[in-house]
Amino acid sequence: MDASAAISQLRQGQKPEWPQNANTSDFAKTLDNSSEFPKTLRHEYVVPTKAQLKRKTLNDDAQTAAKASSSDDEGIYFCGNSLGLQPKAVGEYLNAYLKTWGSIAVGSHFTPMADSPLTPFQDMAAECARRMSDIVGASPSEIVAMNTLTINLHLMMAAFYKPTEKKHKIMCEWRPFPSDWYAIESQIEWHGLDPKKSMLLVKPDDGYLMTTESILKLIDQEADELALIMLPGIQYYSGQLLDIPTITTHARKHGITIGWDLAHAAGNVELKLHDWDVDFACWCTYKYMNAGAGAIAGAFVHSKHGDNGSNVGLKGWYGHDKSSRFLMDNKFVPTPGAQGFQCSNPSAVDLTCLAGSLSVFQKTSVADLRSRSLLLTAYAEHLLTQIASRNIKDGNFPFQIISPLDPRFRGAQLSVLLQEDVMEEVFAGLEENGVICDKRKPGIIRVAPVPMYNTFEDVYKFMHILEGALQPKAEQKTQAHGEAVEARL
């Protein structure tokens, strides 16, 4: 298979032609060893073994202490869309943080250490912004590392949502992650408005996907009353990647402020926030950026809003310009750019984890990661389709892929819809065999092969386990007994 040609096809929205031996371990290993496209950076991450995934204590026994002797000993981790694996660099960075803090205490804020991977603590947020700039397609001054995602959404809406008697609506998706819903709802209520009248929901035309055409049409219809558009870059349930540049351009034609929640997009797909003229965006860093559970989040504010003046919404001392921050004269001078939107001193330990995780991104590019991701997810889709075709019962497929079939409009994630009672049994079967993915009610198993650390062999092994888990328990026992008898013969 010509992998480079296949990636080119996928970038154009076309499906590659898979060889007859695609559903074999040898084929998966061939892709993993190919020099035609970027290789995995799996060696930069801590990949849990199957034994470690089952541990209930931090004390090691012989099994949990043992290193994987082969890939068969490692778990299959397809949950980077929920929490990314730990980069090995994070441990190094945390050790440097602890030693610096322990050695020079408050001097850690200002004193550079010659042999440390860290900058002085007061400069860490700016360094993380610099490292995130290529990932989201912005200049460092347009990015700030602060808070967590929902707090940043609130701060951005406090600055950019300016409802009037006529223009008061916020457009959002029909099924946002609950925290987004609560944030939008409470911002509307904070202004004394009724969410039932001021929340405008974009609904799918059919099934689970929102079309660009329907979004643009709704903007046209509601433009006179829209004060803000806030949509997800990638919808968390379906994995749909929205057409950010087209929708943003259309909002701009109507003079409507537009912001994006990029929780599932940042570090996953190529973004050009500055060039696309996005007003603001927010993202978390614990998914595809691998900075750890609840890690410090990121926000983007376009440079056209970066002069700030006094219009940074809610203020705090850390948004004050660094050059005069410690004068303490209560005369707010905002830091130019996105960092003027800071309120509090960001957590240095959180920034340490983020800086460590971002150091791995400096060894690759988002374009290379996207190329690898396109092929990984297309391979997963191909094998899922084969499994579905082999397991039709009573004329029904065992599951449905609800993510977009056009590879241009999805990231790493494929959302597999099963009947909810079946989902629990299948999910348990996956876990029993060292597979980690996640489930979302009703009936969805989200499968996300992450290009940073997942392999084509991971995909192949996952599919073999999934097909076994789809079989009713009685059939599994019969099949296992038959295989045991055959082995004795």
Swiss-Prot record:
Where is it predominantly found? cytoplasm
Q: Which cofactor does it need?
A: pyridoxal 5'-phosphate
MF (Gene Ontology): kynureninase activity; pyridoxal phosphate binding
| Reaction it catalyzes | L-kynurenine + H2O = anthranilate + L-alanine + H(+); 3-hydroxy-L-kynurenine + H2O = 3-hydroxyanthranilate + L-alanine + H(+)
Q: What's the Enzyme Commission number for this chain?
A: 3.7.1.3
Q: What class of enzyme is it?
A: hydrolase
Where is the sequence biased in composition, kind Polar residues?
Answer: 1-12
Q: What are its GO biological-process terms? A: 'de novo' NAD biosynthetic process from L-tryptophan; anthranilate metabolic process; L-kynurenine catabolic process; L-tryptophan catabolic process to kynurenine; quinolinate biosynthetic process
Q: Which amino acid positions bind pyridoxal 5'-phosphate, per UniProt?
A: 149-150, 177-180, 261, 264, 286, 317, 345
For the modification N6-(pyridoxal phosphate)lysine, the affected residues are 287
Record bears the keyword Hydrolase? yes
Pfam family membership, one: Aminotran_5
| InterPro entries hit by this protein | Aminotrans_V_dom, Kynureninase, PyrdxlP-dep_Trfase, PyrdxlP-dep_Trfase_major, PyrdxlP-dep_Trfase_small
Q: Which family is this sequence assigned to? A: Belongs to the kynureninase family.
| Protein name as it appears in the record | Kynureninase 2
The protein's organism comes out as: Phaeosphaeria nodorum (strain SN15 / ATCC MYA-4574 / FGSC 10173)
